[in-house]
């Protein structure tokens, strides 16, 4: 699985996930306004006034 991850210049860098990491995730902390993209082992989608998380399982789906 390949996912996007964040770097200094934004969240468009590609990374190859480990065998344990089955999901790509995109998270947004609405309080700090920080984004995080990357590979995760488990993922539960969430959307509240302060936090957003989207999970997916296909290559580069977490744009």
Swiss-Prot record:
Q: In which tissues is it expressed?
A: Expressed by the venom gland.
Q: Enumerate the UniProt keywords alphabetically.
A: Disulfide bond, Neurotoxin, Presynaptic neurotoxin, Secreted, Toxin
Gene Ontology CC terms: extracellular region
> Would I find Secreted among this entry's keywords?
yes
- Is-annotated flag, keyword Secreted? yes
In this UniProt entry, which cysteines form S-S bonds?
3-24, 6-11, 17-39, 43-55, 56-61
Range of residues in the leader sequence: none
Localization terms from the record: Secreted
Q: Provide an example Pfam family for this protein.
A: Toxin_TOLIP
Q: Please indicate which superkingdom the organism of origin belongs to.
A: Eukaryota
Q: Which residues cross the membrane?
A: none
Gene Ontology terms for molecular function: toxin activity
What function does the entry list? May enhance presynaptic acetylcholine release.
- Family, similarity comment: Belongs to the three-finger toxin family. Ancestral subfamily. Orphan group XIX sub-subfamily.
What protein am I looking at?
Answer: Toxin S6C6
**Source species:** Dendroaspis jamesoni kaimosae
């Amino acid at each position: 699985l390949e996912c996007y991850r964040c770097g200094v210049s934004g969240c468009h860098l590609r990374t190859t996930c480990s065998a344990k990491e089955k999901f790509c995730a995109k998270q947004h902390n609405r309080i700090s306004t920080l984004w995080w993209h990357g590979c995760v082992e488990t993922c539960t989608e969430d959307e509240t006034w302060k936090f957003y998380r989207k999970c997916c399982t296909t290559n580069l789906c977490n744009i």
